A protein has these predicted regions:
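Charged, surface-exposed helical/loop "interaction arms" that form contiguous linear patches used
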Residues: 362, 366, 376-379, 397, ...
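Conserved phosphate-binding elements of NTP-dependent enzyme cores
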Residues: 1-2, 8-12, 19, 537, ...
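C-terminal tails and terminal domains of large nucleic-acid-associated
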Residues: 832-869
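Charged catalytic and DNA/RNA-contacting regions of genome-maintenance
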Residues: 1-332, 345-348, 352-361, 365-457, ...
């Protein structure tokens, strides 16, 4: 038995999209069949049914309503599935035979444009990576905003550098020219850390590209200025990305016309671990925005501004001129309080112009989207006026370049009613007076409805049926309804159409003639209104460059205002940023931690790193604030280099080229690395990639191995860091107090400690950093504060006292203890165990012990002594 024509059509389309879930439009539903149906049923918890397909067995089938399909598609895309949307491409009422269908779009994790599937404050990037031996090209595109960036990596460990770039953009989908097994670290990072869909099966996208097409799209200048040719890795990645977008979206990509090519030298170097440990845009544990630097700095009013601020935080600048340009804009807004407040009020009513334009280009925009765009355009002229008196170069430039788009705004306002319906297919959204032809047809509908009302009244009078009424439905059109109690009074000219419980429905020839006029007018109105809407859409799409430029200006202005607002609210200061090699901070505070303190003030601290004081060797107890102090310094540097004010009473920041952190000791079990191996791997990366202009944080190096090994490695790292080979600005926190002697041995090493005081048995953290080494670590006191049982704390006190008794008089005289010292420590521990056994014997009441109990006590003591050997 052959398959039905519809099923044959389905197979023909499905064969073109074998690795996709095919959403096949049937009436008001998207249906899935066979394996697709089983997958969708499982993933979406849908009922699996069947459909006759011409074969003995029914085809497995499940479906979703087309009007609510987005939520189902979003769930599938989030799990990495690709969705092929197959629509009816002709009106079923006009079709001769089988309705024509074709795939109009493919939705993948990196090609989502639907607002309901996107985070408005975050870009949704698609990435392509082209591997070329020791170099690689990367390209990132957010097709919902038309943002495209590209870069090239040409030296060093490309695996680490690619992961750093991926961490900055966090793409949802990655196209790779190389097999995942060739670069397993990148694949694992993309999959496990980013949750990205990694596709290494589309090698053909990276072959036989068209460089001339790229030059036409983005302009020759961007390629010539960076010496990029047809064979450049970045160009091959870009070409693959554009081809993939065209293949999946099946629309004119004229709106993707601007390329930002960047080099690593433009931005502050931030590796993967540094981004995570500083919690720039998401927290380590909960992966949330709250508790991050972005959370503190984000007082943007627009989705576009929120996305741009995130990008700035992920990519701080290194050019002093570019930083000062931003800084001056923020500073002027801080001083212009009234104008800033008014601009914030204006921006509050701005829509997401970038994503609205994408909907217009994709022909998925409706009347409400057009009014949202109009609302945003109506704000442009007042914004330009508020910027009239601004003198900082950046704000003046934004003002002068801002196109208020009055022609587009006027067109939308004349054409679209203020509160349009959702659908553009059913009419009712074109303003009265915009089109004489539409107005005339609307008048026919209005007059027709008035005529219907008059007919209803006259028929009541003619027939004497008081309850007679005229109604309408899509099946029968207009009809006369009479209850059963009056049906004997119905005149012969009434034609019975439908019998219902309690009433009869009739039609008349006169009613049908008027119905044809009214409904004909309605159909024509719907068609003409849609035609006018398409003209409007095409006009706006033809001005996409102007709208994108205005959106870019508004987003930058929004970020500047946000940074100014945060500076004013949090008592930040404008840092002095220059090309010096010093970091001088007075009364610095942690921007995030201070926001969580409710009943106490954050204790500020100073930083003084310069040519002579290069490495701060920080000692002090756990929980005293060493990690907070080091992180706050890194965040202040980063804030300064995005153009922000900083939490301090004053700050002078010599621009840093790279920022590194080695914080935390959690095992990377998924990668099979122990705490110590992970620590050493990260240290090796830092030492290989840092320069004299870098800033490094080391927190407790060497804890994952034996004391002497750890101490030796920590010392060697310090010595190398302050050597002529590196001499990077560094903060090094340690519990190895023996290392403090390096202040006298190594140029640039300076001892600091976090102050803590004991008041009786109570330990008080003063959170203040001062010159000099800590006199004690207070480890046992910290254990007590942490809630360790008293019995354990007392035991620790005894062990410490015994160790101190057998320790060298001056441990600094020999940084690496001799073996006999270690033996003395072991002997001391054994002596303590014997003393404890003796003490336990003294406490026994032999007069009350039974023989069995005595044997039990003896067994316990024997086990204790054996455990000491």
């Amino acid at each position: 038995m052959p398959y039905t024509p519809m099923m044959l059509q389905y197979f023909d389309i499905k064969n073109q999209y074998k690795d996709h879930l095919l959403f096949y439009r049937l009436g008001d539903f998207y249906e899935m069949f066979f394996d697709d149906a089983k997958t969708a049923s499982r993933e979406l918890d849908l009922t699996l049914t069947g459909r006759d397909c011409g074969m003995p067995e029914r085809a497995p089938m499940c479906g979703v309503p087309f009007h609510s399909a987005d939520s189902y598609i979003a769930r599938l895309v989030a799990k990495g599935y690709k969705i092929a949307i197959c629509e009816q491409t002709e009106d079923p009422a006009l079709a001769k035979g089988l309705v024509k269908r074709e795939v109009i779009r493919v939705i993948t994790p990196g090609t989502v444009t639907e607002s309901g599937m996107l985070n408005e404050g975050k870009n949704n990037y698609l990435c392509a990576v082209f591997f070329a031996g020791a170099s690689a090209g990367l390209c990132f595109a957010d097709i919902s905003t038309a943002k495209v960036c590209a870069t090239q990596i040409t030296d060093g460990n490309i695996t680490d550098k690619i992961c750093s770039e991926l961490a900055a953009f966090a793409p949802k989908e990655i196209l790779s020219s190389a097999d995942r097994m060739d670069y397993p670290e990148i694949y694992t990072f993309a999959k496990d850390r980013l949750g990205a869909f990694f596709d290494d099966t589309r090698n053909e996208l990276f072959e036989n590209g068209s460089f001339s097409e790229l030059e036409t799209r983005f302009g020759k200048e961007v390629f010539e200025s960076h010496s990029l040719g047809a064979g450049s890795p970045a160009v091959l990645a870009l070409d693959a990305l554009i081809r993939y977008i065209r293949e999946t979206q099946k629309v004119d990509l004229a709106y993707i016309n601007s390329l930002e090519y960047y080099t690593n030298e433009l931005y502050l170097g931030l590796d993967v671990n540094t981004r995570r440990s500083l919690e720039l845009c998401e927290t380590l544990r909960t992966k949330e925005k709250r508790g991050t630097l972005l959370w503190v700095l984000d007082r943007t009013k627009t989705a576009m501004g929120a996305r741009l601020l995130r990008k700035w935080i992920e990519q701080p600048l290194v050019s002093v001129g570019a930083i000062l340009n931003r800084q001056q804009a923020v500073s002027e807004l801080v001083d212009s309080y009234i104008e800033k407040e008014e601009l914030q009020n204006l921006l509050s009513s701005v829509g997401d112009m970038e994503r609205l334009m994408t909907k217009i280009v994709y022909n998925t925009a409706g009347g409400k989207d057009m009014r949202a765009l109009y609302q945003t355009i109506s704000v442009l002229a007042p914004v330009k006026q508020q910027l009239k008196g601004m003198v900082s170069p950046e704000l003046a430039r934004l003002r002068d370049e801002l196109d208020v788009l009055s022609d587009i705004g006027d067109y939308i306002d004349r054409a679209i009613v203020e509160d349009p319906p959702f659908s553009v297919r059913e009419g009712g959204f074109i303003q009265r007076g915009f089109s004489p032809e539409i107005d005339e047809l609307n008048a026919i509908q209005t007059d027709g409805k008035s005529w219907i009302a008059s007919v209803e009244q006259s028929e009541r009078e003619l027939t004497g049926i008081k309850g007679l009424k005229i109604g309408y439905n899509r099946v029968f059109g207009y009809y006369i309804e009479v209850t059963n109690s009056y049906k004997d009074q119905v005149p012969d000219r009434y034609i019975r159409k439908q019998t219902l419980t309690g009433c009869e429905r009739y039609i008349t020839q006169e009613l049908k003639d008027m119905e044809a006029k009214i409904l004909g007018a309605k159909d024509k109105v719907c068609a003409l209104e849609y035609e006018e809407f398409q003209k409007l859409r095409e006009f706006i799409a033809g001005n996409v460059l102007r709208v994108q430029k205005a959106a870019d200006i508004l987003s930058k202005l929004d970020v500047y205002i946000s940074l100014a607002d945060v500076a004013g609210r949090n008592n930040y200061v404008c840092p002095e940023v220059d090309a010096s090699d010093s970091i001088l901070i007075k009364d610095g505070r942690h921007p995030v931690v201070e926001k969580f303190l409710k009943n106490e003030m954050f204790v500020p601290n100073d930083v003084n790193l310069n040519e002579n004081e290069r490495l701060m060797l920080i000692t002090g107890p756990n929980m005293a604030g060493k990690s907070t102090y080091m992180r706050q310094t890194a965040l202040i540097i980063l804030m300064a280099q995005i153009g922000s004010f900083v939490p301090a009473s004053s700050a002078k920041i010599g621009v840093v080229d790279k920022l590194f952190t080695r914080i935390g000791a959690s095992d990377d079990l998924a990668a099979g690395q122990s705490t110590f191996m992970l620590e050493m791997t990260e240290c090796a990366y830092i030492l290989k990639n840092a320069t004299s202009r870098s800033f490094i944080i080391y927190d407790e190096i060497g804890r994952g191995t034996s004391t002497y090994d750890g101490m030796s490695i920590a010392r060697a790292i310090i010595e190398y860091t302050v050597s002529k080979k590196l001499y990077a600005k560094t903060m090094f926190a340690t519990h190895y107090h023996e290392l403090t002697e390096l202040e006298d041995l190594c140029r640039g090493v300076v001892n600091y400690n976090i102050v803590a005081k004991k008041r009786g048995d109570e330990l008080i953290f003063l959170r203040k950093i001062v010159r000099g080494a800590a006199d004690e670590s207070y480890g046992i006191e910290v254990a007590k504060l942490a809630g360790v049982p008293d019995e354990v704390v007392r035991r620790a006190d005894k062990i410490l006292a015994n160790i101190d008794e057998h320790a060298p008089v001056d441990p600094k005289k020999n940084l690496m203890p001799k073996k006999e010292d270690a033996g003395a420590m072991t002997l001391g521990l054994e002596t303590m165990l014997y003393e404890e056994v003796c003490e336990a014997i003294k406490k026994l009441d032999v007069n009350t012990l039974t023989p069995i109990e005595a044997l039990g006590k003896l067994y316990e003591m024997k086990k204790s002594l054996e455990g000491a050997k």
